[in-house]
């Protein structure tokens, strides 16, 4: 096998489906009513039900952490277990942690700034400040699991999850790590929801059961929240240790221009032809401008040949849900014979991305 072939061998998620090890399967999720803060009009979101991380990972302490940090720790533990990895037998200096997030630890950032506004910075809670840093979740993963390799956090708007996969692939293919824990996550908070409301980007179709990408009735997106962790390693390494393989990452490309989707997707085909792609994983979310832009890319590159799945219909919109969208597609493709899939990402403010995978 080529050293450029990279396998996903472990999956852990904290999502509206709950904390899960491995594939999501054919589970269903429901829109929930936002009750933690007052809202203007429609009050719907794909929310993670509250849970105690220590109930999922015994002994895990998260009381002083931002929710995102706690979720990333849980997702990492689940992914490592799913990959059948015992870190005691690994060189922890050769393990990388890569996190993609749109907003980072926004919940405790809000709390810290509110404390500073009310009492002045001199009286603001100093314990909160370290947990406001965007790279805090990745740092906690390294601390808790004793990982000493490259530790990178990136934020690329709506392409943060896709960017994390590509950064991890660069580290692995460049020989800087043997193994990567790839994380992506964001939480929904009052300030974020209020901003969405003020910007008039949320769907207000209260009667709709879910966002409706590509539908003439679409009128905006429904927000979501999640944290996802996957273990990536070379295909040779995965095979030698008998690890389960969910998908093989082939290649990926990004552009800062959201209108460059056609050229980016064609580059990501990497020698394959459009009919070879058996599944297009869209990032459409019910917003007319984004749906029209990505829809045009799909029609131009793939015509009407490739099946399209729009996971934000049941996951909601968040800047870092690219990896979770892939996991959802893996669940739907579980019984197919190793199809080629294209993960598309379109962000009107962040550009576009296309990543190709061979599903198991």
Task: Give the predicted meaning of each segment.
Residues 10-12, 98-100, 155, 180-186, ...:
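Short beta-strand segments
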Residues 19, 108-111, 165, 191-196, ...:
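Short acidic, glycine/serine/threonine-rich loops at helix termini
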